[in-house]
UniProtKB/Swiss-Prot annotation:
InterPro entries xref list: Dimethylallyltransferase (IPR039657), IPT (IPR018022), P-loop_NTPase (IPR027417)
Name of the gene encoding the protein in the UniProt record: miaA
UniProt key word Ubl conjugation: no
Species in which this protein is naturally found: Thermus thermophilus (strain ATCC 27634 / DSM 579 / HB8)
Protein name in UniProt: tRNA dimethylallyltransferase
Entry binding sites for ATP: G9, P10, T11, G12, S13, G14, K15, T16
Residues involved in substrate binding: T11, G12, S13, G14, K15, T16
A GO MF label: tRNA dimethylallyltransferase activity
Family to which the UniProt record says this protein belongs: Belongs to the IPP transferase family.
Length: 302
């Protein structure tokens, strides 16, 4: 089975730029592995490729859900594997691009075959999370399965799902049998120095505010006043807090910058332990393009 290329790395490292530039030279189609780009209407805060860019370089799993719809890792896996197969069937090369490590890990390593979600149990767990706090519930999961606790990290949605499975079945998710991956993957992880990345994250956040992020979030809140999961994304959550009167605009920007830097740190930690066929490229943005093309030439003949 031929391998599928994966371009991963922390937020702001230039993955979208590299994919778009490659797509202008080579007949590739992007399969997005980004947990927020799946949502329609979340454009500025996700740095989503524009419709014009996506017309030049086809993208899959972008703008496929409304903000109130849920995207689980199982749903992502099914959609992504379907998209990859579709691209291959037309003689094109799929390029998986994204920074949602959990999605990329599911693609390349397979996914545990868990029972379907139970909304009632999940609702009770969300209430418990609000009352007891994330650390208390994470400690409960860690006692049963340190592996699951490491995997969910501080992601409340994944924590709720893991505890739901544990409490319903008595078995933590990591001990369920795993469905093998449908395809084989080779991964290139952008690994720029933090001194290079973090100032760019600050400038990107400021640019998003200048481009109209506040207006984008205001429109989403008018349509979805109950703050669905999609509006908990970095940037959207911080701006929503401002629009709901919790703090001023300047503090919203400061919170956004802190949140995106913290997210990038978590991505560095996650991708540092990426399994499988992985190469780390110690650059980002335009500086990484030559290394990216060399890697593609070596492994894929592009």
């Amino acid at each position: 089975m031929e391998a599928i290329p994966v371009l991963a790395g922390p937020t702001g490292s230039g993955k979208t730029f590299l994919a778009l530039r490659l797509g202008e030279e080579v007949p590739v189609e992007v399969v997005s592995a980004d947990a927020t780009m799946v949502y329609r209407g979340l454009d500025i805060g996700t740095d989503k490729p524009t419709p014009e860019e996506r017309a030049r370089v086809p993208h899959h799993l972008v703008d496929v859900l409304e903000p109130h719809e849920a995207m689980s890792v199982a749903r992502f896996l099914a959609l992504a594997e379907e998209a990859i197969a579709h691209v291959l069937s037309r003689g094109k090369l799929p390029l998986v691009v994204g920074g949602t490590g959990y999605y990329i890990r599911a693609l390349s390593e397979g996914l545990h075959d868990l029972p379907p979600p139970d909304p009632g149990v999940q609702e009770a767990l969300w209430a418990e999370l609000e009352a007891r706090g994330l650390e208390a519930l994470l400690a409960e999961l860690a006692r049963a399965s340190p592996e699951d606790a490491r995997r969910v990290g501080k992601n409340p949605r994944r924590l709720v799902r893991a505890l739901e499975v544990l409490r319903r079945t008595g078995t933590p998710p990591a001990r369920f049998p795993k469905r093998p991956p449908r395809f084989r993957y080779k991964k290139l992880v952008l690994w720029p120095d933090r001194a290079w990345l973090f100032p760019r994250l600050e400038e990107r956040a400021k640019a998003q505010f200048a481009r109209g992020l506040v207006e984008e979030v205001r429109g989403l809140l008018e349509r979805y006043p109950r703050m669905p999961t999609a509006l908990q994304a970095i940037g959207y959550k911080e701006v929503a807090g401002h629009l709901l009167g919790a703090y001023g605009l300047e503090e919203a920007l400061e919170r956004d910058i802190r949140a995106v830097k913290a997210y990038a740190k978590r991505q560095y930690t996650w991708f540092r332990h990426e399994p499988g066929d992985v190469v780390y490229l110690p650059r980002g943005g335009e500086e990484a393009y030559v290394g990216f093309r060399d890697w593609l030439c070596l492994h894929f003949g592009l």
